[in-house]
Structures are given as C-alpha cells and as structure tokens.
C-alpha cells in the first residue's frame, strides 16, 4: 500500500541520516545465524544471514548494528520499528506478510524443508504424521514449524515450547522430547538426528 511505501521511505531516510541500520536476529540457527564463541561483541554473530545484513548495510553506506532476541520477538520488533530489518531465517507466511515486508527469496525458499527432527536411530519409527501421536515435540513459538505441529500432527501431540533450536536439540539428544520441529538444514549440523 501507499502507506507502507512511505514507512519504508522514512526508514531509508533515517538509516541514511544516522548512518546505522539495526538488524534483529535470533542467533541460534546455524548456518544462517549463530554465535562464534571465539569472537567478541558484534563480530561474534556469524552466518549467511549476518553476511547478507553486512552486505545490505555496506550498500546503504551504513554501519550494521545487530540486536539479538528470541525468534518469537523478531516480528514484533520489525512491526514496531524498533529495528530496521530482520534477517533470521524467516520463512514466508501470510501473517508475516501483513505486518512486515518480506523478500521474494524468503517467500520462495525455506518453507519446503520443515519437518520433525528425531534421533537418527529412531527415524524409521516415524514415517507418517500419525506416528507422532502422543509424542512430545519441541517447537519455537511464532515459527512456521509451530504452525506445522499444531495443524498437521495428531491433536494429542504434547507441545513443548522452546526459546531456541539449541534448546530443542539438547532436549532431543537427552530424551526429554521425542522430536523437534525444525529445518532439515539445521539437522545437517547434528549427525545424531534425522
């Protein structure tokens, strides 16, 4: 809408005037965004989404400020303009599109690799959605994976809300949950899960 375009124009003017662009991320989703423990401060945030943020800042002639937050807080931060943008493995959804501008790449990408991550040695036990009946599934609130769990799995699935994928993987590998709703891309970092 015309009103949205004015908001974006004002944001661009603000970025150019201050020389700073503020980006929200939830740095717990390697390889997109995560923390390099050998680095400090803003340099400790690394990954593909961080590099994209740096590129955008460079093209705008601005300094990139990274603000970390729980994934479920990102949409509100963008909607309230407390940050200029979010690059945090945000898959497209109609709800998100109503409250923020989304790039075409996110709309075309990331939503196809969603699923339930399970221990690799139990993968053969889970071949249909019904196989998760009565199971405990960890999921981040506000994600498309949450929508997957609540709409496509049996109603008796026990949902365990988590604040980060790292928490979910820890719960899965220690047997506290039967699965974690997540991305197959994320699973590539953990050979013990499928």
Give residue ranges: language-model regions.
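Short loop->beta-strand "edge-of-pocket" segments that line small-molecule binding or catalytic clefts
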Residues: 21-25, 129-143
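A ligand-binding cleft/hinge motif common to bilobed small-molecule-binding domains
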Residues: 73, 90-99, 148-152, 166, ...
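Flexible hinge/capping segments at coil-to-helix
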Residues: 106, 118-137
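Ligand-binding cleft/hinge of the Venus flytrap
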Residues: 33-40, 53-62, 107, 145-162, ...
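Short Pro/Gly-enriched coil loops immediately N-terminal to beta-strands
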Residues: 79, 100-117, 165
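Extracytoplasmic small-molecule ligand-binding "clamshell" domains
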Residues: 3-90
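Alpha-to-beta junction loops
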Residues: 22, 61-63, 79-89, 135-136, ...
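Short helix-initiation/N-cap motifs at beta->coil->alpha
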Residues: 65-77, 124, 159-174
């Amino acid at each position: 809408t015309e009103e949205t375009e004015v908001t974006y124009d004002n944001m661009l003017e603000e970025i150019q005037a201050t020389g700073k662009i503020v980006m929200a991320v939830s740095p717990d989703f390697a390889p997109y965004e995560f923390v390099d423990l050998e680095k400090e401060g803003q340099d400790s945030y690394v990954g593909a989404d961080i590099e994209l943020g740096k590129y955008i800042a460079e093209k705008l002639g601005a300094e990139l400020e990274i603000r970390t937050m729980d994934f479920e807080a990102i949409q509100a931060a963008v909607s309230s303009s407390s940050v200029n943008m979010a690059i945090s493995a945000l898959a497209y959804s109609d709800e998100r599109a109503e409250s923020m501008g989304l790039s075409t790449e996110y709309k075309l990408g990331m939503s196809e690799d969603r699923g339930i991550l399970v221990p690799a040695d139990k993968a053969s036990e889970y071949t249909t959605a019904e196989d998760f009946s009565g199971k405990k599934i960890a999921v981040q609130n506000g994600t498309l994976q949450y929508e997957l769990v609540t709409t496509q799995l049996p109603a008796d699935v026990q949902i365990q809300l988590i604040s980060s994928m790292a928490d979910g993987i820890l719960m899965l590998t220690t047997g506290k949950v039967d699965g974690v709703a997540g991305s197959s891309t994320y699973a590539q970092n953990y050979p013990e899960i499928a």
